[in-house]
Amino acid sequence: MTFNVLPLIQYWDQPDPPAVIADRMEGWSQHHPGWSYRRFDRTSAAVFIQEHYGADLHDAFLDIRLPAMQADVFRIAALQAQGGVWIDAATRCLAPLEGWLNLRQPLVLMRRAHQQHPKICNA
């Protein structure tokens, strides 16, 4: 797999994120000029889900009212359908991924919850 076909995927529920979020999202495409980059909002994510999974998941996605939960469902749907790198919208890119990850091997990253403070978390 080459880097330029590995999609970077981000989600913000509205078409126009707040300036600080938009700036952080833009940083990912700037640090990865040869990569495929897709930013989804609620509408474009719903279309993607409809195309890849059909009406049931599409309707369930649209019934979700919390944007963070929408992002959780869409993350799984997008990565299952096409693979790629999911990047939380609030995450700032400081350096290209090629510099610190071996992306030629299958990889899943997840941060483990602290034992005294269990929670669902993503990395």
Regions flagged by a language model, labelled:
Residues 70-117:
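GT-A fold catalytic core of metal-dependent nucleotide-sugar glycosyltransferases
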Residues 35-39, 65-69, 114-116:
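Short, surface-exposed, polar/charged, turn-prone segments marking secondary-structure boundaries
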Residues 119-123:
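Substrate-binding rim/cap in mid-to-C-terminal beta-strand-loop elements of soluble/periplasmic
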Residues 26, 53-58, 104-105, 109:
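Generic alpha-helical propensity signal that fires on short helical segments
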Residues 49-67:
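ATP-dependent phospho-/nucleotidyl transfer catalytic cores
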Residues 14-21, 64-72:
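Aromatic-acidic/polar surface patches that form glycan- and anion
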Residues 1-55:
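N-terminal anchoring/stem segment of glycosyltransferases
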